[in-house]
Amino acid sequence: MGNAVEPIPLTVNIAVLKPLCARANKPGANVEPQVQLEETQMTGSAGRILTTHAGSLPRSEALRDLVFARAEGKPYDKQQLAAELRTEVHDVVRRQFACGLDSVNDGELGKTNFTNYVRERLTGFEARPSEGGTGRRPLSIAGRDLKKFPEYFAAGGHGFGGFAGSGPSRSQVYCVAPLKYAGHDALKEELAIFKAALAGVSVAEAFLPANTPGTIEHWLRNEHYPSEEAFLHGIADAMREEYRAIVEAGFLLQIDDPDLPDGWQMYPDMSVVEYRRYAELRVEALNYALSGIPREKIRLHVCWGSFHGPHENDIPLRDIVDIVFKVRAASYSIEASNPRHEHEWRVFEDVRLPEGAMLIPGVIGHCTDFIEHPELVAERLVRYAKLVGRERVMAGTDCGLGPRVGHAKIAWAKLEALVEGARLASRELWGRG
């Protein structure tokens, strides 16, 4: 395609990194990595538990204001935004590297939320004042909890960390024409900035997230396509351009799909059988969009909406895990450390991973500002490793930490705990480290 970006060279061997977060104790600090390297072949978990995270990382208030101004159509300084993005992405890549993370990204520093993502990347829609939830589609990803705990939500107890779904909806986005991808320039800039930031940094993986058709559908109401299936495939046709461009640029594609679990809350009247049909349809559309992309270039991230709330009515992982594993991915990142879902490691006592696939359980959470103890992180990783195999586990986070914890330093401290916990788990599982 005309907007393809030249692939980046990533090392075939990976570096076993010693955590250096102490050198990067200020968010956004320009840290030049200086590490001792121990070359190992990148096979399975490379003789230890590798580490990654789910996407969003802290950014400065100045950059946040510029990014939101662009997304909301407000005046902003384009040159200042470009300069801030280049600087902060450069710094956040090095900060991840210094922490000892093996699989890094751009921190999603240039993105805002799912609704604005649709507005910036697609055409064929229009925004109109919200109808207050009338019509077929519920608007709350906490819908079942809302029915049981209306007083809690009425009191404002439903923070989203400034991410998608926070606050009252001022407008609703309607699909009124064939959906087309229009994010070529924004994506080209995003890829180029990340590529430049990686120069001189040796990592196991460099990944970029993109949203699934099902997740995008959350924030669009269909007034154009003749059926639900046609609508989903319309989104898939548009978004496959972004998916392919990310992979063609040399990056791992992370598909963010909170839709698979959190759609259950959006449709409170569905039975599990009905919801499984709902989820199957969206996986079919996603796999259609991913067709032609090598499976080993794809990882899937699923979570239960990441809002701060009761989550009592989340669908159990066991009810949908087989559908999750139908997504054509080489690794599966699953929220797994919060108080509602941590017990679900037992699902893997009798559920097998797809052949050759990796599991990335969230062992660090965003639902609390408590810093997880590295020994707790290690315990969580060892549990999974004993069930699916130590070579098939990678340490991850429940969701993006950037907008969901109380301060940037908390997010980075959590990632320090992640890396140290993985080191402790590796020592137990391999008898070294």
Question: Predicted segment positions?
Answer:
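Domain-level signal for soluble alpha/beta catalytic cores
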Residues: E32-G433
